[in-house]
A protein has these predicted regions:
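Functional surface patches built around histidine and acidic residues
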Residues: 2-10, 21-154
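Bacterial N-terminal signal peptides
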Residues: 14-20
């Protein structure tokens, strides 16, 4: 979990991210996960009286790049470089008043990714935060573990 307010704080707050090792269920699941993660995130938001997040393709490309960098070992698992990702989104899409990021790692399905985030107070704050857009990306490492990134903005 990482959240940046209007002043884009530089403090990095980890919410106790632990690897979630859950097996995927059959071929094709990997390609569907972005939509499934969005579905589960928005279902939680709806159950809390919040508006759904809109999936943004540019934010998803930024999230995918971060997941690829973590999977390749170019950057460690976590939120390193979050400020640069938000600047990149800001440059492309205009001013951002609020931003956050959730990451996860392991072979898992979308339901388990979101359930893990919802069981972590910091990640849950992002899912239920004051955001309107989201980007979701994932990548596999050489061992087959999947790295997930979800970026939230307003």
């Amino acid at each position: 979990m990482f959240n940046i307010n209007r002043k884009i704080r530089k403090a990095i707050l980890f919410a106790g991210t632990l690897p979630f090792i859950i097996s995927m269920h059959g071929p094709g699941r990997f390609e569907e996960m972005e939509k499934e993660i969005l579905h589960f995130v928005n279902a939680d938001r709806k159950s809390n009286g919040l508006k759904p997040l809109e999936l943004n393709s540019f934010e998803s490309s930024v999230a995918m790049e971060h997941s690829q960098n973590m999977a390749s070992g170019k950057t460690p698992f976590g939120h390193k470089g979050m400020e640069a990702r938000i600047r990149k989104i800001n440059k492309e899409m205009g001013p951002i008043s609020n931003a956050g990021e959730n990451v996860a790692v392991g072979q898992m399905n979308a339901s388990e990714v979101v359930r893990g985030w919802l069981n972590s107070p910091g990640h849950k704050r992002n899912i239920e935060g004051d955001f309107t857009l989201t980007g979701i990306g994932y990548a596999k490492d050489k061992k087959g573990e999947i790295y997930f990134t979800e970026i939230f903005t307003k």
